Amino acid sequence: MSKFKYNNTIKNQGIQTIFGLHSVKAALQNDKRELIELIISKNQINFDKKYETKIQKITILPQNEFTRRYGTNNTTQGVVLKTRDFSRPNLEEFVKIESKKSKSVILILDQVTDPQNIGSIMRSCALFDCEGIIVGKDNSPELTSSLYKSASGAAEIVNYIRVTNIRRAISYLKKNNYCCLLYTSPSPRDR
């Protein structure tokens, strides 16, 4: 028996770090989120003015301290938000909510493991009014800082639903009157 026990309920106390101007702005505007701390570099001093009423703790760091904490790469854009993620619906809850609408578009992805690809797809989904993305738990990334950054705010409005079995998810959607159009890329031997 291992002396190390992993308790996924404690994992990082549910605190997420979101960075980048668009991602942080979208998270600050999401009333479902519990906001913990907004950290900005002095170079982004005007950023906090708009959100002073939304968040209790705002920390303004000198540029050299901000760089020491968050790195020299430009991906943070001088803005970091510490927050707790909000409750996201599972497949059954999502279908129940969406069934009240006249139309609903869902994208199902399998074997897309790069968080930056998922983030890019989320941006496209937001543009085309796709309400959700369904992915397999074993072959997809969790919602991480890099996924939030590449989604550029779309992760706040597009539901990200991780399921154990995609085939069962498709069957469930069909039983709930969804028309499922499937595409798979050809295998190497089919080429």
Task: Give names to the regions the model predicted.
Residues 183-191:
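Single conserved hydrophobic/aromatic residue that forms the stacking wall/gate
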Residues 96-182:
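RNA substrate-binding interface of SAM-dependent RNA methyltransferases
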Residues 29-32, 148, 152, 189:
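A generic structural signal for secondary-structure junctions
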Residues 1-100:
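N-terminal positively charged helical leader segments and presequences
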Residues 21, 42, 84, 109-112, ...:
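Fold-independent oxyanion-binding glycine-rich loops
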Residues 30-31, 101, 176, 187:
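Alpha-helix C-cap/termination motif
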